[in-house]
Amino acid sequence: ALDNENNNKFLKLNNEKIKAMKFDILKELQLPKDDLINYMNKLKDYIYVDEMNDLKIGGFIRWIPLKDPDEIYLTNGAILSEINVTDNGVLLNCKNFAKKHYQIKLDECLVFQKLSDQEKVLLFALDALSK
């Protein structure tokens, strides 16, 4: 897992830091306490992604659209199939299990990517080393 260059970002993280990062981001939305807890539970195996370089094609993502502040919700998610950099920003092309295609703008959503099994093992080991 450490030989994979894509995992280098995890060397500075552990499960507690990832959880705190998600909590801080969600707290900024000023959600009711029950919604905040619900989202934290639903995003248990996910990491917040704000950099295009941290996204993985083929990875499963969930997002919270920020366009309408009165309607904040967590999507069911989709598989990231393509990343396009345009004059309008970074566009993420996704496909869900019903084969429906989505295109979302990275800067108009909070994006969370599901951790792979390899990443989970690496984080577990880093947690153990930090104790």
Could you tell me what each predicted segment is?
Residues D68-N88:
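Short beta-strand-centered aromatic/proline hotspots
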